[in-house]
């Protein structure tokens, strides 16, 4: 006679339908971290691979990670806040922090336009793509008007716009901007994608 299968472990996440997953830490008034990641990497959505970096913060933050960079940032954010306000959850975060990696620039623009930068106590730009003029102009203006709450972690190539990359880095200054360079081990240089992804490891040090 075969042994009965063990019950599946309960899902530790709350699912924001069509938008992403929400982790709640034990302290109800912990800060809320809103994360929009980039394009698929090796066929894996950012809603999966961004948890590789965010899991280290689970004891200190409520964390939402979007399914992918194709979500509507406004709808995702509103879904999170609606979930937190439900009677059986009833959480009001002490502050809200916006984290944008790579292609997360786009849903980031959505939520910044609809909710305003003032909603967030901190805005982290992590090697975001700014290869279109409209995107570059948007984030230049954001840095001009909100430098005191922003950090910028970047590679030499991720922005796809060296002029805007340098403008934002200079606008924020050396204490708020970090240039991540490729590791070199002997004659072997770290692949560009590995350096790009490693900006997340560096960026979460600011949290």
Regions found by a protein language model. Give the residues of each.
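Conserved hydrolase catalytic core segment
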Residues: 110-121
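Alpha/beta-hydrolase fold nucleophile elbow
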Residues: 90-102
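Glycine-rich nucleophile elbow surrounding the catalytic serine of serine-hydrolase chemistry
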Residues: 100-110
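C-terminal catalytic histidine-bearing segment of alpha/beta-hydrolase fold enzymes
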Residues: 20, 151-207
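A domain-start/cap signature at the N-terminus of enzymes
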Residues: 1-32
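Active-site machinery of serine-nucleophile hydrolases
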Residues: 11-13, 27-87
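Active-site nucleophile loop of the alpha/beta-hydrolase fold
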Residues: 124-132, 154-158
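Alpha-helical scaffolding within the catalytic cores
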Residues: 19, 45-56, 79-83, 108-112, ...
């Amino acid at each position: 006679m075969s042994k009965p299968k063990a019950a599946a472990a309960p899902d530790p996440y709350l699912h924001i339908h069509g938008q992403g997953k929400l982790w709640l830490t034990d302290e109800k008034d912990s800060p809320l971290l809103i994360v929009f990641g980039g394009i698929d990497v090796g066929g894996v959505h950012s809603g999966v691979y961004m948890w590789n970096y965010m899991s280290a913060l689970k004891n200190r933050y409520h964390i939402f990670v979007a399914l992918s960079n194709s979500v509507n940032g406004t709808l995702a954010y509103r879904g999170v806040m609606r979930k937190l306000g439900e009677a059986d959850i009833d959480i009001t975060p002490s502050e809200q922090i916006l984290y944008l990696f790579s292609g997360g620039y786009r849903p980031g623009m959505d939520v910044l336009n609809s909710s305003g930068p003032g909603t967030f106590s901190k805005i982290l730009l992590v090697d975001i793509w700014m290869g279109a003029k409209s995107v570059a102009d948007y984030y230049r203006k954001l840095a001009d008007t909100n430098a005191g709450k922003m950090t910028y972690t970047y590679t030499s190539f991720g922005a796809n716009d060296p002029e805007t990359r340098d403008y934002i880095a200079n606008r924020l200054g050396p204490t708020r901007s970090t240039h991540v360079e490729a590791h070199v081990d002997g004659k072997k240089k770290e692949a560009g994608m590995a350096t790009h992804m490693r900006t997340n490891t560096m960026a979460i040090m600011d949290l």
